[in-house]
C-alpha cells in the first residue's frame, strides 16, 4: 500500500493514519498522525514539517518530536572549539524553539520527547554529555520548556 502525503488512510475500522512527507533537498522523511477511538498520536520524530502542523485539525493526545541534535555538524567538523560551541548553541535554540512552537500550536495533552540524546560510546565522551554541543539531554529540554510556560 502506498500512502500519499497529506491524505488520510483508513487502515481498519478503528485506525486512520495521515502522513506528512518532507522530500526537500537532503531531507527525505515523514511524520505520522495516528487516530484511533482511544487516542490520537502525532509522531514527528526528526521530520522537519513544523510549517505544516496546522494541517492536523484533530485534538492530539500524544505528540512526539526530536529535541536533541542528531548530526555530526558542528561537533565533528574542523573548526575552533569556540565556533563549534556557538554553532551548537544556535542550532540547539532553533530546534528547541521549533519544539515549543509545535507544542503551542498543537496543544497536545502529552508531549513525549524523542530522538535524544545521542550516545557515542567510541567517540569523545563530551559528545555524549551534551555540554557545548547539539546533543542536549532531557534536563536542558525541561528547563527550556519551563521557561516558555510549557
Regions found by a protein language model. Name each.
Residues 2-72:
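Core dinuclear metal-dependent hydrolase active-site scaffold
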Residues 52-146:
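Cap/insert and terminal regions of metallo-dependent hydrolase folds
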Amino acid at each position: 500500500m502506498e500512502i500519499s502525503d497529506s491524505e488520510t488512510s483508513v487502515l481498519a475500522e478503528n485506525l486512520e493514519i495521515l502522513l506528512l512527507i518532507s522530500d526537500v533537498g537532503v531531507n527525505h522523511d515523514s511524520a505520522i498522525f495516528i487516530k484511533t477511538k482511544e487516542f490520537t498520536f502525532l509522531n514527528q520524530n526528526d521530520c522537519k514539517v513544523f510549517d505544516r502542523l496546522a494541517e492536523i485539525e484533530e485534538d492530539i493526545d500524544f505528540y512526539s518530536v526530536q529535541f536533541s541534535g542528531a548530526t555530526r555538524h558542528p561537533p565533528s567538523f574542523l573548526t575552533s572549539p569556540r565556533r563549534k560551541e556557538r554553532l551548537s548553541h544556535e542550532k540547539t535554540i532553533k530546534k528547541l524553539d521549533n519544539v515549543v512552537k509545535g507544542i503551542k500550536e498543537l496543544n497536545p495533552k502529552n508531549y513525549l520527547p524523542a530522538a535524544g540524546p545521542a550516545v557515542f560510546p567510541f567517540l569523545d565522551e563530551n559528545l555524549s554529555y551534551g555540554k557545548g554541543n547539539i546533543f542536549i539531554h532531557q534536563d536542558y529540554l525541561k528547563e527550556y520548556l519551563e521557561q516558555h510556560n510549557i
